[in-house]
Amino acid sequence: MVTATTTPPQCWRGLPALARAPPPLSSPLRPRAVAAAAPIYPLRRRIAITTTRGRRGTLDCSPRCTLETAGPGFDPLGLYEEGSNSLSRSPLSTFFGIMAPVFGSSSGGGASREKASGRGAAAAIEDSSIDIGDFFKGPLPGKFLKLLGFLALSRLGVYIPLGGVNREAFAGNLDQNSLLGTLDSFSGGGIGRLGICSLGIVPFINAQIVFQLLAQLYPKLQDLQRKEGEAGRKKVLQYTRYASVGFAIVQAIGQVLYLRPYVNDFSTEWVLTSVTLLTLGSVFTTFIGERISDLKLGNGTSLLIFTSIISYLPASFGRTVAQAFQDGNYVGLLTIILSFLLLVLGIVYVQEAERKIPLNYASRYSSRTGELQRSAYLPFKVNSSGVMPIIFSTSSLALPGTLARFSGLDFLKKAAIALNPGGALYLPTNVLLIAFFNYYYTFLQLDPDDLSEQLKRQGASIPLVRPGKSTAAYIKTVLNRISVLGSAFLAVLAAGPSLVEQTSHLTAFRGFAGTSVLILVGCATDTARKVQAEIISQKYKNIEFYDVNRFGQ
């Protein structure tokens, strides 16, 4: 038996005659009369429905939702703009439509409500029903306290210095090395302070780079990441941890050898103690990063670097301002500030840019038009890889210098000088590495073949594209084009600050260039997005979608 409740007459206001008429007899959702005792007129939030295939669903019986569902184009989530209703709405009516669930009367009598925006009920809930009080109702306060505790713990090791080193002389040498200055900003000043956690998360990042390159050379390792799912990724992560310990030992030895001119008593005991402390500090920082990732409020590696850059920002900005006032270069200071603001705006714009591919679902059939209705889309971000290519590129450029300090080979020393910021090979090598890591990381996160198979299993298809290999080829083409745009964007970030420095004749934010701004903006937007998703999921847990007994059905 096909059952559904009839739409109340007061919900028909403003609808065309065709929309008021009952569905045809061949419709999979054919209404029947409801008993007189059943209250059908009050404005209910949800009414249960049952179709011939035994599927359960809900029908929003408020006037705003009836206007959305009764029209010829059923688009409750408002993912498409080609509907006639969306073309005729004004921005003012859209605003009042979104705010209607918040300020509207729950009794339904007397006052008429504005139509909701074409984005639908789900978007209205997301946009208008989240306030500051919702943050304190779920587990988010506890998660944020844990996050702040982990971040404070990671900063503690930066202020515990190695003994027996002339830090003033080393800090003066650090000012002359731009690449070390950049790495110092990533460690939050840990290298300049010679803290036991000065290596930070860099050894773990280097280990990730090596395993991602090995995955291209050894297909078994690539299959372990992709085909074995979560279990395979955990195995690769465990191997990466072991490799990061090896990288930490090598980098600790290199840093100790680099500190030799500034050490009062360079003995074997001091070397072993310092290498052990630096290695343990790196392992400890990596452990904290993984615990932060488990909170699902953002990537632990990115958040650790985010905290380090934030802690480094005041001193860096103060140094630039002091230099500008000392030289009387006020125009250059204004140029740097304006460039910084434009850089932030550009990063936010590109970070939120998406390429949306519409999807058709075979199970979503419109009884009024007799056609399949598009009700979802596949989003691809222009900069889907985020800040990881820049972090990988910076760590790769620092690797020759570390190896040169460890081995003392002349060609490595020359390569390190050429790859330093301002060197002959720094800019082209940095751009090429960013493009490579961006392309690779994009396809590491999104496998076109796997994505095509998932769409096929879910009964979804891209319009005018055959399921299977054709869909995979189409997705690969889209990702190729997106990766080119993302690489160009990241290359501009890498090259832009040096051009600003040449124009303003100031050392603009030593170690705090476009890469650091991208990390800050990317981490902030990612964390805000995940907090919003957590609040919305918490609110949906309290919604009763199939409360049939409540209405006597």
Curated annotation (Swiss-Prot):
Intracellular or extracellular location(s): Plastid, Chloroplast thylakoid membrane
Chain ranges passing through the membrane: 144-164, 194-214, 243-263, 270-290, 297-317, 330-350, 384-404, 417-437, 482-502, 505-525
GO molecular function, a single term: protein transmembrane transporter activity
A single GO cellular-component term on record: chloroplast thylakoid membrane
Record PROSITE patterns: SECY_1, SECY_2
One Pfam short name: SecY
Subunit structure: Component of the plastid Sec protein translocase complex, which is composed of at least SECY and SECE.
Functional note: The central subunit of the protein translocation channel SecYE. Consists of two halves formed by TMs 1-5 and 6-10. These two domains form a lateral gate at the front which open onto the bilayer between TMs 2 and 7, and are clamped together by SecE at the back. The channel is closed by both a pore ring composed of hydrophobic SecY resides and a short helix (helix 2A) on the extracellular side of the membrane which forms a plug.
PANTHER family: SECY/SEC61-ALPHA FAMILY MEMBER (PTHR10906)
Protein name stated in the entry: Preprotein translocase subunit SECY, chloroplastic
Organism of derivation: Zea mays (Maize)
Gene transcribed to yield this protein: SECY
